[in-house]
C-alpha cells in the first residue's frame, strides 16, 4: 500500500443561467464605466452563424473596395492549379456556400460602419474571443482594421465554434443550445500590456485567489502586488458584487500604468471550463471562506524565469505542427528537425530522379 495521499475531486456545478450572466452583452451593460468602448450587434442572423460554421472561408469581393485578402492572384508555374485539383472539385458534392454580400448584406454593412466609427477593433462572440486564431492575420493579434480580417479571425477560431455549438457544455440543467441568440462584440482596439492582466476567483462573494493571466515572469510585479490587490478588492466589492446576480464568478481585469485605475476585461463562470491558470480548480474549491470577513487571499505570480513559457507563443499549439512547437523550445530539437528535413528532401530528390530515368 502506498502512503501517498489523494485529493478528493470536488464537484463545481454550474447552471445555464450562470453561463448566460457571463455573456458580454449582459454584464457589460451593468458596468459601462469599466469597459472599453464597444459596439454589440445582437441577435446575429442564422446565415451568419452558418457562414462561421461552414468549411472554408468565403471572403466578400466588393466593387470599388480594395482588400489585400481578395486581390486577384496572377497564375504562374508556381501557383497554378493542377489537373487533379480540378478533377476533385467536379467529383465533390456541390454545397451552396454562404456569402456575406448575398446572405447577410445588412450585417456586413453594420460591420463596416462599426469599423469606420471605432477604427481598429477586437471581436468576440457572447463569451469567447478568437485568441487562438491570431496566426491567420499578418499582425498576429486580434486587431482587425477591415471587415475581411473580422471574417478570417472568426472563421479560423475553435473558441468561436465552442460558443456556437457547446456554450452550455457541462451545465447541470442541460446543454441544449436551441433558441440561443448570438451577439457579435466589436471592442475598440487598445494595446494592453499582458503582464498587467489578472484573473480573480470569487466564491460566495469572497475573493479566494487571483493570478496573472500571462504566464511569463515579470520582475516588477511582486513589489506592486499590494497595489494590485487594493484595486482588485475595490472593483469586486464596490462595483461588481452589488450588481452581478451571482456570488461566484471569475473576473478578468486590467490594471494599466500608473496603477490608479482598473478595467473589466471579462466575467467567466465559476466552473472548471474556465482556465484556472496558476491555480488548480480543486485548490480553489477547497479554500475556506475568510473568518470575520477579513480577506487575505493570494495574488499568485510567476516568481522565476521560465524560458519555456517565454519561448512559446500563446495558442501556438493550435496552428503549427507539434514538432515545430517542441523544436522552438529546444535547440537540440531544432538541429534534429533540420536534419530530418534534409533527409526527406534528399529522399524526395532521389525518387524523382529514379522516376525520370524509368520514363526514359
UniProtKB/Swiss-Prot annotation:
The keyword Magnesium applies. It is found in: Cytoplasm. GO terms for biological process: eukaryotic translation initiation factor 2 complex assembly. One of its GO terms (cellular component) is cytoplasm. It comes from the Eukaryota. Its main location: cytoplasm. The keyword Magnesium applies. Changing residue 252 to A: Disrupts assembly of the eIF2 complex. Mg(2+) binds at residues 266, 268. Keywords: ATP-binding, Chaperone, Cytoplasm, Magnesium, Metal-binding, Nucleotide-binding. One of its GO terms (molecular function) is magnesium ion binding. Disruption phenotype: Inviable. Induction: Expressed during exponential growth and repressed in stationary phase (at protein level). Levels not affected by the presence of mating pheromone (at protein level). Present with 4850 molecules/cell in log phase SD medium. Interacts with the eIF2 complex gamma subunit GCD11 (via C-terminus); the interaction is direct and appears to be specific for an unassembled form of GCD11. Interacts with the eIF2 complex alpha subunit SUI2; the interaction is direct. Interacts with the eIF2 beta complex subunit SUI3. Interacts with DMA1. Interacts with DMA2. Belongs to the CDC123 family. PANTHER family: CELL DIVISION CYCLE PROTEIN 123 HOMOLOG, D123 PROTEIN. This is Translation initiation factor eIF2 assembly protein.
Amino acid at each position: 500500500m502506498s502512503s501517498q495521499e489523494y485529493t478528493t475531486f470536488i464537484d463545481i456545478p454550474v447552471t445555464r443561467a450562470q453561463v448566460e450572466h457571463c455573456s458580454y452583452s449582459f454584464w457589460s451593460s451593468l458596468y459601462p464605466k469599466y469597459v472599453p468602448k464597444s459596439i454589440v450587434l445582437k441577435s446575429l442572423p442564422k446565415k451568419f452563424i452558418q457562414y462561421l460554421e461552414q468549411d472554408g472561408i468565403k471572403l466578400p469581393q466588393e466593387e470599388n473596395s480594395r482588400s489585400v485578402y481578395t486581390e486577384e492572384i496572377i497564375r504562374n508555374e508556381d501557383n497554378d492549379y493542377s489537373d487533379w485539383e480540378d478533377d476533385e472539385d467536379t467529383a465533390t458534392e456541390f454545397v451552396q456556400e454562404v456569402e456575406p454580400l448575398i446572405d447577410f448584406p445588412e450585417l456586413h454593412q453594420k460591420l463596416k460602419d462599426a469599423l469606420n466609427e471605432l477604427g481598429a477593433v477586437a471581436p468576440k462572440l457572447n463569451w469567447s474571443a478568437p485568441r487562438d486564431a491570431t496566426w491567420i492575420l499578418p499582425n498576429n493579434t486580434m486587431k482587425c482594421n477591415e471587415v475581411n480580417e473580422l471574417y478570417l479571425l472568426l472563421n479560423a477560431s475553435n473558441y468561436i465554434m465552442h460558443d456556437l455549438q457547446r456554450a452550455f457544455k457541462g451545465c447541470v440543467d442541460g446543454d441544449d443550445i436551441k433558441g440561443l441568440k448570438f451577439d457579435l462584440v466589436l471592442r475598440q482596439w487598445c494595446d494592453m500590456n499582458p503582464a498587467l492582466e489578472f484573473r480573480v476567483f470569487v466564491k460566495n462573494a469572497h475573493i479566494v485567489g487571483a493570478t496573472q493571466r500571462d504566464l511569463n515572469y515579470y520582475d516588477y510585479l511582486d513589489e506592486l502586488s499590494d497595489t494590485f490587490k487594493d484595486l482588485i478588492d475595490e472593483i469586486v466589492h464596490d462595483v461588481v458584487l452589488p450588481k452581478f446576480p451571482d456570488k461566484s464568478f471569475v473576473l478578468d481585469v486590467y490594471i494599466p500604468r500608473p496603477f490608479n485605475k482598473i478595467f473589466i476585461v471579462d466575467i467567466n463562470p465559476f466552473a472548471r471550463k474556465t482556465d484556472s491558470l496558476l491555480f488548480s480548480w480543486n485548490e480553489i474549491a477547497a479554500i475556506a471562506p475568510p473568518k470575520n470577513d477579513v480577506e487575505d487571499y493570494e495574488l499568485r505570480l510567476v516568481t522565476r524565469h521560465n524560458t519555456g513559457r517565454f519561448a512559446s507563443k500563446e495558442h501556438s499549439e493550435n496552428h503549427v505542427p507539434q514538432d515545430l512547437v517542441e523544436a522552438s523550445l529546444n535547440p537540440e530539437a531544432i538541429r534534429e528537425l533540420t536534419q530530418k528535413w534534409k533527409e526527406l528532401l534528399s529522399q524526395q530528390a532521389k525518387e524523382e530522379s529514379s522516376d525520370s530515368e524509368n520514363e526514359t
